[in-house]
Regions:
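Solvent-exposed beta-hairpin/edge-strand motifs
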Residues: 187-199
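Active-site-proximal helices and loops of the catalytic beta/alpha 8
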Residues: 1-49, 79, 96-131, 136-138, ...
């Protein structure tokens, strides 16, 4: 129970269930955000949340990353690194594991470097170097930006966004958590650089944005 979390440095939570629901269009962005903010309030600074898409149980009994998340997988992987907490990786994710490993028997996976390896290297480097992603008692601040989004095509909100800030760095995460294009305005202003390509990105409340399905931005200043 939540009464025990201060006895441990880190703990699991049910976030991957909600990420799976998002990938399969069975949940709204509002429901996802409400869950994660509820978990943050319960744990506060007592305990580090483990954010993940796969564990041994999830892989063996529910499915591979492709089965569960499809094209949303890169965006949701980035989310587990950027949202407050510590990312947890399961064996084989770095090699684009695309099968269910046997649970009670020895199994293996091909160690062939694919697209996910580069993604994880970039995310890991950012996690280790940016004080905007610090966790624990002196963790970076968190502020939801999702309420600043206004969709322009009459659909329910598809955009999940938040800001994290440390003493030196400020980071903004913006994600289209939908299989459809998102057209929206964003009541937020600032000059940033995209990670990892370093391109300048200007955010303005006067702009209209279009994001591809499952597209995400990691913006730093």
């Amino acid at each position: 129970g939540i009464q025990l979390v201060d006895k441990f440095d880190a703990s699991y939570h049910s976030g991957n269930y909600f990420l799976k629901q998002i990938a399969q269009a069975k949940m709204t962005v509002s429901e996802l955000e409400n869950h994660f903010q509820s978990i943050m309030r319960k744990h506060q600074e007592k305990n580090i949340l483990l954010n993940y898409t796969l564990t041994h149980d999830v892989n063996s009994w529910q499915g591979s990353s492709e089965e569960l998340y499809g094209d949303a997988y890169p965006m949701l992987t980035a989310f587990t690194y950027i949202y407050p907490g510590m990312p947890l990786l399961y064996s084989g994710q770095e090699y684009d594991l695309n099968k269910r490993l046997l649970f009670f028997e020895k199994d293996n996976f091909p160690k062939e470097i694919g697209e996910t390896m580069d993604l994880l290297k970039d995310l890991g480097s950012l996690k280790n170097t940016s004080d905007a992603l610090t966790v624990g008692k002196n963790q970076a601040s968190f502020f939801s930006l999702t309420p600043k989004v206004t969709m322009n095509n009459g659909v329910e909100n598809q955009i999940f966004s938040f800001q994290r800030a440390g003493e030196k760095d400020t980071l903004v995460f913006v994600a289209n958590m939908s299989k459809n294009y998102a057209q929206f305005n964003f009541d937020f202003n600032g000059n940033f650089f995209e990670y990892p390509n370093g391109k300048e990105k200007i955010l303005s409340d006067s702009y209209e944005y279009v994001m591809k399905p499952w597209e995400y931005w990691i913006l730093i200043k």
